[in-house]
Amino acid sequence: SIFAIGYRSDQVANVKIGYGTLIPDSKYPISGILHESDIHQSKRCPENYRLFRLMVPHNRWNGNEESVLSCAENLLAGNPEKFVKIGEREIPRYKPGYMRKIAQMNTDCTYIGWSVSGVSITHVIDEAERIAEQF
């Protein structure tokens, strides 16, 4: 599952600006924290706020959203301004060589989307921003 959690910037001043954090320890329900408002050029949250995306694999938590919130508060800061489950997704999987095959295609058009730029939401958003800048 994917959660969004937002804070006033002063609440998370101790969290370094950056891409995010991987959490390999399976005792935590959160496997990764993406610093959404730090890594994207487009506005992700109001000024003086920071937005984080929490990646929560189903095999690492009991389905109780409070356990995710508690973990996030321990890792980031307490009392977030916003905490919401935004979806349940599975990362698409491709056979080895798929991206190389796509890169070698000769076409008269430009392809966009996760099937050609990468499967992470960050790749998709970066690609969308790149295309938007061309207009």
What are these regions (language model features)?
Residues 32, 67-71, 127-130:
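Alpha-helical elements of Rossmann-like donor-binding domains used by nucleotide-donor carbohydrate transfer enzymes
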Residues 64-111:
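Flavin (FAD/FMN) cofactor-binding core of flavoprotein oxidoreductases
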Residues 21-27, 43, 95-98, 120, ...:
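Solvent-exposed, flexible loop/coil residues
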Residues 1-66:
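Mid-domain catalytic core of redox enzymes
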Residues 74-75, 130-135:
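C-terminal alpha-helix
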Residues 40, 59-61, 89-92, 116-118:
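Short Gly/Pro-enriched loop/turn and capping motifs at secondary-structure junctions
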Residues 53, 102-132:
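Short FAD-binding loop at a beta-strand-to-alpha-helix junction that anchors the flavin cofactor
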